[in-house]
Amino acid sequence: MRIYEKRENKDKNKLLIRKYEQYLLLEKSLSNNTLDAYMTDLDKLLSFLLLEEINIFEVTLDDLQNFAAGLHDIGIHPRSQARIISGIKSFYRFLILDDYIQSDPTELLEGPKIGFKLPDVLSVQEIDSIISTIELGKKEGQRNRAILETLYSCGLRVSELTNLKLSELYFNEGFIKVEGKGNKQRLVPISPRAIKEINSYLTDRATIEIKKDYEDFLFLSRRGTNLSRIMVFHIIKEQANIAGIKKNVSPHTFRHSFATHLLEGGANLRAIQCMLGHESITTTEIYTHIDRNMLRSEIIEHHPRNIKYRENEKRKAEEQEYKDSSVNNEHEK
């Protein structure tokens, strides 16, 4: 392929990618973070096609399988591989819809098999332990406590938390307004305890020199801008380490714990779906798996037959230990 042809193809691809980006943004209503992830993943495929001198409209299943094998070879995590392949499938469905191609080369493309993994969940005691380690005497102490109480009280995504606005707090009614994925808004109940911690934080917030355009953001950095997601990750990691929690704790762990504890307490699954902002009930149903595990451990721990079985096994072990020690004593004589 001549150099000018390469350049021409690259320019055409840029226009096409821009059109696809608009499609995801407007028709699929993806959030900016999800959109960025889609485009970054697609860029990996485009770089591969450019390197292999393959036209984007003439890609075959073999080409895509070679690309997928390359992801594995360079050590990309299986979950990330699956996400990238899912994004590529979305791109080629778009090409079909807009009549750029007639058949879908990704139809038989498979990603790596991903085992079902339940998310980490904190117990109520672990949540209390993490929050209680926050020193209110420190400069950002009250802010950090308000952040953790809000995450646990409302089950927010970290991006929803960092984008919370003062104008979206309806404390008299006991709700906050949240902008979730795809710019979809929802009202989420907030607990009296979280309201109390936020109100205490607002006193500290009033002393911050707030930068222009950030006046309405609830949670601010010491520089007077809204907190980044990374900052919230660091706050939670630090407090979990101080509390001696060995689990892999993140903002999303608080969200998982919120949903699981509600379900354990008897909350309706549909209500939990609304609070989490899940489009599909199947996404929320992951928490029924967590609840089943909890129920199983409760049955193993407390069912009378299991208690009796454990007692019998313990007695047998003690009898065997006694017999073994008796035999050893005889040998020693």
Task: Give the location of each predicted region.
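Conserved catalytic core of the tyrosine transesterase superfamily
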Residues: M1-K333
